[in-house]
């Protein structure tokens, strides 16, 4: 074969290969050959990737061996080595020609496709050149048959084995022109003959050129062979005698061809399974990546997301589809035929089933039709029967409905009759209750008909008035004798206390009625309470009725001429201040229920004052004594009309008073007048077997009155308990301290702690006289109610009893069932306008009441109570006019009469003359120089002006808080710094120390060359006469070792080890180690010899020194005179350093105040010459360092004062104008014997006050929010009892529950709190019951600052509700009326034109709690924590009374005048009447 023929054939094969690969690529991409263009050559990147992925790329092999022949690797290497470098140019030219031929074939194919009808002859191809025209020899290459090799590779895909593998051409090696086809399966078979199987190509083109016969001659050039590896078709059985060749040659190979999963599968199936699993895994990964799937950590699984989740996850969008069609599985024609047959078979079967189903349906319809025709008569009969049953059912239901209606009508009529009967019985019950209340009130009051009694009462009042203010003011202070007696009582046993106070019952007091009925009824106090009966004769009842009627008429006549009706606004107000004040009223007034309680208490209190008032009317010094009751209270009394049965009878008004009881000796301290009256009232309750409510205003001493009652029972009635007192948690310890203070003779058990501690306290408490009083909280008494119910209590006292007004709560039910003899409720809150709450308290007091006939009757139920009093009282509250009907007023009068015996309430306004006065002072303080500088600097900042102009509430509050800090103390705004010097490790001198040494060294380099030491050369011989003796010189000359030394040197020089001949001993040979060591030794010994020679020379000169005369001769001829006079002038001038420091210590302390700006640490070392660069001998340096380490530094104090400067302690006071004023005020208070409380809002101010008080040496105590409740009680008790403590500094946020600081008479507000309620609580801690001196309140205000502006505006706008303190809260009116200009002044806010208020948010204005939270954001963290702790203490009490169930409150706005209800049964016929009579006779239920 010639070279041209070979190139042409190669080009033909390359062209066929390209056609096949294009066709495969088109099928892969589009799954159809409909639009396939065989003339188009793909050169895109996707086509190259397709060839690479399918392993169809065409590359050149370097195998030069003949196909079908096996050659050894050695022979191949030899041929390669021989042919190296040859044929490279020929191969490149051949490849170039092949490409041109392939391109020409594509051009011919495009031309044929464009002109399919034209016939073209054989074209003569264009030769590329001379080299292409040169023919190869015919015998250069021998024709060989093509060998088809099959390679086996288990790792390739099975789908690619079905299609014939095309030929791949790869021009990798230009040296070899052998081509092969790479099949992905990689299967190899043995060699086969060319006649058995031949390779084939499948192409869509039918135009093929005839095969050119090649010459069989062998050429000398290296043979380029084509190695084709094709995939042969599978063996098919075409004859029964045909025997298939087994695929596996052995059994082992056959077994290895299967894989075992759940069952045995073939390799192909296994590969298919693996491929499918890979696709599933890739799909899952793609789903996770695109966001369609998600991984659930909890279930450890992959979950699909919903459509909503897919819409929300916009970040993970699926990738766009890159192909239009998926690759379909390629089936053969036989497979398509089989599938078509299966589909047609199924279609025929479905049609058959459909025809059968339609036939069955038609037959069923025919059958149903004939059945319907046959059953028409029977069906008609059944429908008629069904219709009749429906009519009968409707008739029965109508009759039954009518009977039900008649039954309801009968029940309504019967209920009306029962209600009528109940109203009659209720009126009878109410009459009995009113009669019983009259009896109780009459038993409490004692008629003073006898003139002797009147005289004794006058004497008693004069004795009481003669006690004076001094005796009245000693309620909170104990005399020494009383304290000693209290201590003795606390040490006595119960039997000794009984013996000590047993004789007190025989003591009689002047003015006490010995023959009264009440006294005779209480002679035997140990009888059962049920045995006490309230009995009055008919004459006494009538007389008492006439007395009340006459009293009412007289007072109403007086009030009619002096009082005026209230306005509508005054009637509708229900604030605590009006409920607690005395209200004038007449017959046309509109009294509310809240005012009824105050009026009842006032009437009772006024009745108690009648006898005293008459006895004191002739006393000239009534006002000085302070015992006369308030004249305004008497003039403003209200007594509603009490209509009795006997209206015709009337008598003169008699003076009535509560029976006076003696003050028990067991009580330590003196009761005030109103407290003594309260004790009398409580004692009358006990004597009349009645419970009551002590409702005095907060701060009037309900605790001391209760303790006095228990002491009275112990001393007078010999009733030592046990008593149960239930109080809020926060005041439990306060009650215990009050018992120890006023009644130390009682054994008090404070029941609190953990369950184990409470169990330990209950151990043995059933023994006689184990304790007298048990104090516990509401929460614990309900928790341990089973233990408390088993014990019998003499008195159960509830503090803050208004919190048990909910009768549906479990606490109310539990306390109601306690085994108690008497009950007392203490409350300082006015009772609300709620009939249900009022009934709850009254029923709790009187669940059972004794009657005249010895029977026990319970209190009225809630329904009856609301029926009697509910609607009239609601009508009064909701009324807009001043006139009411007589029935309403009579009902209110009855309510007065019911409540009058059980309630006592006094206000501070009634007893204000018996309390010390309160004075308020405002001290304006000037700002210090530093404060003024910081204040003006902060206000002049651009940021501050922008913040104030912004109008943001929180930003403005933050600015105001900073200004308040400057006013309180500048250290709160900016701490005065501690001055220290800037410390440097090295000074400037150390940088030039080395240079200085170098310069000195260079300057003195030749100094020794020109200067001759005459002393060393013995030329200065005259100096030897002053320090040398002749004997010493002779001895040195005689003892010198000159000869021995010179011999040793010569011997060393002539040592045999030293080489005598040496060229230059200073030059060392570093190339040879031996020579180097020898030369180095010679140099060392020569240097040593020179040193010894010089030493010998100097020693000779020293030994040859001789004096001319000698010092011994000079001493011999010298004459000594008398010693000179001693003088200490020089010793005074040369004092030691330590002495000078001690002498000038005062100067150092006072004037060593200027701290240098910068200091260095190496100055001392440089000055002493101890640095490393100093020219001092190391031995001398070491000696100096040793001496300095042993020496105490005399300059330590001076160095310390100059290195650090602390602010002077006096600057703490002089930096603040308030502290300067406080220093003057405290000095004056200390001299006058006063004790002060200093309150501040900020916790950091307490730290500054501590430093201030320590600086001045005042003894003080501190209480802030971090102080525990137990420690707080101890601190307050110590302050009240220790007069040495002058000052008590407190935080206004430290909580005010149970704090009583009556030991102080001065209150100083260092700064004002945002919440005015806090300031009022702070005042009440000092100005309360128990205070014996006038209270002065000082408020510090910085002038010309925000504080003075706030105070000025507050005073201008302060009216009734401008700053309202209600229920511990404060209104936002304070901030809603003030603007920035009002707070900072017009001078500071000239640039702010808007005068909007600080707080404009309506939500914040309506919610005070929200305002408190906003203000807390501007305060310090410590202050916020303190406020939270205070609120937490309040929440503890709130949790004691918090219940989930609430009592239904009747609406006061409910319309009383209801529309008349239409009578449903009006005009009933005779049938309905018959039905009702039938039901009434009871026949319906038989």
From Swiss-Prot:
Residues 63-89, 113-219, 446-492, 508-530, 548-590, 606-628, 1436-1468 are annotated as: Disordered. It is found in: Nucleus. Residues 164-173, 511-523 have a biased composition (Polar residues). Its main location: nucleus. Its EC number is 3.6.4.12. InterPro entries: Helicase_ATP-bd, Helicase_C-like, HSA_dom, INO80/SWR1_helicase, P-loop_NTPase, SNF2-like_sf, SNF2/RAD54-like_C, SNF2_N. Residues 467-487, 1452-1465 have a biased composition (Acidic residues). Residues 683-848 form the Helicase ATP-binding domain. GO terms for biological process: chromatin remodeling; recombinational repair. Disulfide bonds: none annotated. GO terms for molecular function: ATP binding; ATP hydrolysis activity; DNA binding; helicase activity; histone binding; structural molecule activity. The keyword ATP-binding applies. Residues 321-393 form the HSA domain. It comes from the Eukaryota. Residues 148-163, 174-190 have a biased composition (Basic and acidic residues). Residues 193-204, 562-588 have a biased composition (Low complexity). A motif (DEAH box) lies at residues 799-802. It catalyses: ATP + H2O = ADP + phosphate + H(+). GO terms for cellular component: cytosol; Swr1 complex. It is an enzyme of class 3 (hydrolase). Belongs to the SNF2/RAD54 helicase family. SWR1 subfamily. Catalytic component of the SWR1 complex which mediates the ATP-dependent exchange of histone H2A for the H2A variant HZT1 leading to transcriptional regulation of selected genes by chromatin remodeling. This is Helicase SWR1. The lineage of its organism: Eukaryota, Fungi, Dikarya, Ascomycota, Saccharomycotina.
